[in-house]
Amino acid sequence: MTSIEINNEDEYRLETSTWLAENIDLIEEKQPFSTLHWMPSRERENQHHLDCQKRQKKLYDAGYAGVTVPTEYGGHGGEPWMQRVFREEAAGYQVHTGFFNSIISMTLPALLKHGTEEQKKTHIPSLISGEVSWCQLFSEPGAGSDLAGLATRAELDGEEFVIHGQKVWNSAAIYADMGILLVRTNPNAHKHEGITFLLFDMKQKGVEVRPLIQAHGAGHFAEVFIDGAKCHVSNVLGEVDKGWGPARAVMSNESAMIGGASGDNPQQLIQLAQELGKVDEPVIRQKLVAVYVRNKLLKIMSEKISAAVRKGKPPPIHPSIVKLYVAHNRRLEGDLAQCLLGAAGVVVTNKASEWAMELLHARYPISIGGGTDEVHRNNLGEQALGLPRDIRVDRGIPWKDIPKG
């Protein structure tokens, strides 16, 4: 039975819980203190990617990925409440699909809203099934917080764009078959107006992906060099020179996704406190409650934003609030894990200490990736509170005339 054959919530919930119990491992029983995101070896990262891809396909085949996507685009044509029920029943199960979930959350709404019929029918089925891996190609060495200053150029040659430039901090790019790529197509326009959004083939000549190995050994970030690679005009998402709108939508979805992917850290922190015999200490209990409650609030906010995006409506909560909230949560979680373990928390001796070490590593990158805290505070001040904008010396100037470092 598939999701589109069920109209009763109780029946759907029963089918979902039964399928999960028969097909997916419980995190608590099979993978306590699981380390999914910050693995210190390429071998583990590669295996994690393969496992996530298989899990994405398994969820898709069972009707639990692409639940609300129309059937003509490879989805299951279900209702939004079905996604909610699945999330509720899947709590505690190992259904995380790593960066597949992340890139789908960012890319799918943009394709559904801005894509042509051909683009949607071509790309959405393989995106939501995990058959094709995607990555985001936005940030550049000289355009991170000021993304609209990007310099990767695309020049039209007949019906193809010829592209030259560099992207950086591209998660999972080493595995990607396709990418969502921002390029400069009109240097004579103001910097926000000459950008085009492309659906880009990563497996072609002229594309070089280099892993960025971090201090603790992980290499899931990459830098991408593009030297003469091509992209057909049929792969423009939206309009030429009008890519900033779809790009902003992707970034809003990214903020909501980061909040929705908050995981089960509070539950694991509680388990760790119990195992260490510290769960009854007043200060520890106070910190556990704070982390647990903030995590619940974060998921509620993220779901409200995601529900609005799925309906094509403006988000009721500014996505920057969610991004700042999750960054603060990560710091609280990392501090609490180290508080529980003490000096043992900086030496990996077992699964619990390895997990705590990863929380420690994750405390500050989340304040940078997906837009720095400072950028998101500016967004809130200007867009939500109506405060005066920062002084910009490049306002009203063509991109080509803006001084560059």
Predicted regions and their residues:
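A short, Trp-centered hydrophobic/proline-enriched beta-strand micro-motif
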Residues: 130-138, 182
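A short core secondary-structure module
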Residues: 159-160, 164-210
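Amphipathic, small/basic residue-rich leader segments at the start of a protein or domain
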Residues: 1-101, 122-126, 284-285, 289, ...
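Alpha-helix capping/hinge segments and adjacent helical runs
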Residues: 22, 26, 60, 64, ...
